[in-house]
Amino acid sequence: MSTGNLQLYLSGHGSIDLLYENSLPEITLGGSGHPTSYSVVFEHSLKASVVDRALLEVGIRASSMEIPRWKISFNDVVLTREFKPLICVETSNGFFCKLVFDVTPIVTSKQKREHRVEIEYIGVKEFTLDHIGLLMLGSYEAARSLYGFWSGAISLQPGSSVDITLPQRFDHAKARIVAYLPHTDASLVVGTDSGTTVISRSTGMNEFTVELEDVSYLRLEHQGSGGYYPKEVLVSSILVYKIEIPEPSIEVSYNLDNSNVELNISNNGSDAAENVVVVSIAVGNVIDRKVLGELKPGQSQTVALSIKQGSTNTIRVIWKHRGKTMFKDIKVKS
């Protein structure tokens, strides 16, 4: 059987950029010999000049629903000192509980690129902090997006399933699913109108990305023998989205000159590549490194790097876009 539910918090379409970042620490707080706090910093990489909505979610596993003497802070603002979860589902070894906060006023009060979440707990009864997620949306004229976001708690026994009806049809979209698998023998099967994807060989709380075709619903099913403890697959959140947004396109050409390689690095895309760095690597060692900084659309830079003679060298160009690190490798031999 399945228990619990996921609540649809946000859905829509239009010129909207979105960011969804997760921290999945699976760290035990409280009790004897465990830490009393955990913090994480999320980087704000939205292209939108103003954040329209921001949601913070926290998921924990505990043996009891009584968790006194704890505190959740966001950007040094205390959100709560009481344990009042939105939902708790019972598992074979306790409870899985979720809390969701609208932190839009805090985010918009100060224009910051970093957002800090801190959880403090000095209670006797320990609990496991599994999931901290931050979703932010903002208007951005160059973006075209379609999205739906669910958060809550679902417990799936072996053989049980739950259906999620999407607010509209999605075509060639992605689903980001945060879920807990108790054992490598347990699988989470994601079914849609157009096929199934099996998530397996994973344990603990993880984020999984599933490519979707033409879909109007998701069916989440726990497949497994149940010969493991705990028995339940837990689902914490789902983001289904399709987004079209300007991106950088990095091209690299080179000329060899004895123990050096001269590189021409250009951005032929429609958005800037940030924090561009180029390194040369040979036999597992970094031979040389140069920092280029930002490379705007249409820009190019020429840089010389030292390489190891007589060896195959990897020239790696690294950059960031929307908070994600990307890279391109080319092989050269002097």
Residue positions per predicted region:
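Short, solvent-exposed loop/turn segments enriched in Ser/Thr/Gly
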Residues: T36, D257-L263
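Intrinsically disordered, low-complexity Pro/Gly/Ser/Thr-rich segments with frequent PxxP/GP/PP motifs
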Residues: N285-T312, H321
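Short, acidic/polar linear motifs in exposed loop/turn regions
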Residues: S266-A272
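Short aromatic-acidic-glycine turn motif
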Residues: D185-A186, A282-I287
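Hydrophobic beta-strand segments
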Residues: L56, V276-I281
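Disulfide-rich extracellular domains of secreted proteins
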Residues: M1-S253, D271, V291, H321-S334
